[in-house]
Amino acid sequence: EAIDYYGMGSPFAYQAAKAIPELLRNIELQLFHGYRAAGSATVARSWGGMDVFIGSNTVAAGGGIAKSDVDILQEYIHIDGGMPDLLVVHPGVARDLHDLIDSSSFVRVDQSENKIGLGPLMYAQTQFGNLRIIMDRWCPSATGFVVDSSKMGLYTLRPFGWKPLAVTGDSKKGEVVGEFSFLAANNEAHGTITGLTT
């Protein structure tokens, strides 16, 4: 770091800071595709994703998502004592939900309107409560998750931090380290919609 760079205090710190968004994406990906591994001297520890912890509340859609899929799953979860508040789906599934409501037969344009179609869907309302719709690009397109956000989340074991590595030659090396886990309480308070197509 013998050269000063305009707008950058330390190129090394800049590169270390750039690693954190990528690591956060890996954590988000783990929520949907994670598997449990206890770890050993040669195998890294790994935490399971949502599908590992969600219990028996499952609805098999077998095609495009329908409002009845969400309603039936909400009923199952309600009977088991759950009160979910989120519907987490792939963007393609969210578009299909939107298309159930916003079709050309419902579009009306007059002089006071300067847009065509409906805005994005924010909530799915059911007899058993409202679900905030969350689109996530890492969510499998064939699965939707109905979850209680108060009973599911990430736990920080070690926050992200920079650790220096051994010096070789005149180079400076380091790594960004953080350790997180996924907590899910009351597995029957959540559910999945499987077999979705978009």
Functional labels for PLM-detected ranges:
Residues 2, 9-29, 83-86, 91, ...:
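Internal mixed-charge
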Residues 1-75, 198:
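Alpha-helical scaffold segments that mediate packing/assembly in large oligomeric complexes
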